[in-house]
Amino acid sequence: VYTEIARLFRGYKGLRPAELTQLVNSENALVVDLSASNDFEKGHIAGSRNVLPSSFGPEHKLLAGAKSQPVVLVCRTGQTAGAAAKRLKKAGFEKVYVLDGGVAAWQQADLPLVKGR
């Protein structure tokens, strides 16, 4: 019960892999992968942009002009992305999402990953 209540008040929406695909296709969502560079190169969601958590924030140049655009944060498991999503919501970003379960959930859904930068 606590988890469900916390989910309602966190300010961002969690997405399943299929929902992420729909959001990218229908609303041109910006997908930001907060994984370490070497993990990103081993496999990431096509079209996602890699930003290290230490240099990520509402003022990051990648997010310039994206306050009303859907922004989906992704990491390996969903933990890092959740913390970053809260910062974006606080800064006034309207449509902030996190891929529930991260890249691991994407792989479990048998969806493809791209290697390299």
Identify what each model region corresponds to.
Residues V1-E19, L23-A29, S37-P70, R76-R117:
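Rhodanese-like catalytic fold shared by cysteine-dependent sulfurtransferases
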Residues V32:
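Active-site flanking residues adjacent to catalytic metal/cofactor-binding acidic residues
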